[in-house]
Amino acid sequence: MRAVLGDSGVDVTSSTKGAFGGDRGTSLDVRCQVTAEGRGRVGVTISGAPRPRAEYGTGELYTAVPARDTLPVPVGHGWSGLLATDNARQGDPGDGKATASVLLDCAGNGRSLLITVETTLGAATLDDPATRPSFVRTATATAQRADDRWDCGARLGKQVYDVDLPVNKDEYEPLIGADGTCATVPTAARSAVSTARETARARAPREVCALGARDGSSRYRLDAYYGPYAEDARAQYTRNDGEDVTPAEKPAGRLGQSAYWAGADCPDGAPRALYLVRADDADGDARARPDLGYERAALSAFAARSAEDHGCAEPVTP
């Protein structure tokens, strides 16, 4: 954190609750906040996973990653992690604020540690390629210490020297030729799908492919969730779904009239990966002329490629 906030004039608060381990989930919850007046704030959370089922229904299980207006990008360099922001444009209100997360899959026991760092720097801009790695290195350095402290034995990455900028809404490209998170996803004439916003693939615990029309206007969104993020997404559907059958109950299916999901078993006792496709013009309501065949085809292609990259089994699709 010194590289981000400096050495002097900082205020630190911290707390540690719960324990890492147990047959019914791990309750470990570590929080630390460092504030430097006039320079910014860094908040760190270390969460053990999976959580006890008693926590389901009490809110989000893990610190949320911004992914509504921008697409989070992978940390890379051998880490399973993300860099995310609400807005990545220089001078915009969200500039200088970022969330970095790193997932440690502990050796041989199906448990993991999720490290999340939320940073606000008043004078910094994410548009500066020198700034982004310093955000991320706070998370990777914390992950290294957490791995040793809780005897996780995870595969660690290398020093992070560069990180991509999260992808904004207007940064779309032709879907044909996509080579990242949208690779292999087909176009669709009926649904007017011909463009994509995507990120690189690098073992990130969350992946997004946003599909659009020729002018970039949104049509569909494909999401992949791994580890704690898959657990949290299923827990959200368990308590908030309002549907007959949900991802919490079956490996694949249809969410009412608005979406489909798929699932894949992953190695070393990790939670089943979750893949979702949702039309951007749907919020649970029936649509006049849904292109259901395309939605299933897009989900199948997206899930298969993502699962392969993560070493998971062939997905079960609707």
Q: Where do the language-model regions lie?
A:
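Intrinsic-disorder/low-complexity coil detector
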Residues: 49-51, 65, 71-73, 165, ...
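A short, solvent-exposed beta-edge/loop patch
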Residues: 79-152, 243-318
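Ordered, small/hydrophobic-rich secondary-structure cores
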Residues: 29-123
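General structural signal for secondary-structure boundaries
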Residues: 1-6, 76, 102, 131
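Context-gated lysine
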Residues: 17, 97, 111, 158, ...
